[in-house]
Amino acid sequence: MSVSKDQILDAIAEMSVMDVVALIEAMEEKFGVTAAAGMVAGPAAEAVEEKTEFDVILTGAGANKVSAIKAVRSATGLGLKEAKALVEAAPTPVKEGISKEEAEALAKDLTEAGAEVEVK
């Protein structure tokens, strides 16, 4: 009787962490391999790319909700109703995929209006 890959994966999924570790050790011994990630065949590590697109997330309206709504409205061009809904739905993205400079400027404007902001 042949065991399918799905049956093997299901059996492993039901195992405890300690049982999985023991299984891996047994497989390493039986097949003469290691489960450690090797860097032998990989190219030299490249420098980490600097992030070029940022998201400005409104995490809270702060003490002055009206100022936060005005700041969101001026930054996004939304109508009053939409800007109010966005502020009340915090945490929510205000703008996504913008440059670092634009994200920092928007975060500064919103923070000055009393809103709580996060740049990701």
Curated annotation (Swiss-Prot):
CDD domains membership: Ribosomal_L7_L12
GO cellular component, as recorded: cytosolic large ribosomal subunit
Q: Name one GO molecular function term.
A: structural constituent of ribosome
Q: Name the keywords, alphabetized.
A: Ribonucleoprotein, Ribosomal protein
Q: Does the keyword Ribosomal protein apply?
A: yes
Q: Name one Pfam family in it.
A: Ribosomal_L12
The record ties this protein, via Gene3D superfamilies, to: 3.30.1390.10, Single helix bin (1.20.5.710)
Provide the leader sequence positions. Answer: none
Note whether Ribonucleoprotein occurs among the keywords: yes
Q: Which InterPro entries match?
A: Ribosomal_bL12, Ribosomal_bL12_C, Ribosomal_bL12_C/ClpS-like, Ribosomal_bL12_oligo, Ribosomal_bL12_oligo_N_sf
What GO biological process, any one, is recorded here?
A: translation
| Assembly and binders | Homodimer. Part of the ribosomal stalk of the 50S ribosomal subunit. Forms a multimeric L10(L12)X complex, where L10 forms an elongated spine to which 2 to 4 L12 dimers bind in a sequential fashion. Binds GTP-bound translation factors.
Family recorded in the similarity comment: Belongs to the bacterial ribosomal protein bL12 family.
Which PANTHER family does its entry note? 39S RIBOSOMAL PROTEIN L12, LARGE RIBOSOMAL SUBUNIT PROTEIN BL12M
What HAMAP family does its record include? Answer: Ribosomal_bL12
- What function does the entry list? Forms part of the ribosomal stalk which helps the ribosome interact with GTP-bound translation factors. Is thus essential for accurate translation.
Please identify the protein, giving its name as recorded.
Large ribosomal subunit protein bL12
Q: Source species, please?
A: Pseudoalteromonas translucida (strain TAC 125)
Classification of source organism: Bacteria, Pseudomonadati, Pseudomonadota, Gammaproteobacteria, Alteromonadales
Gene encoding the protein: rplL
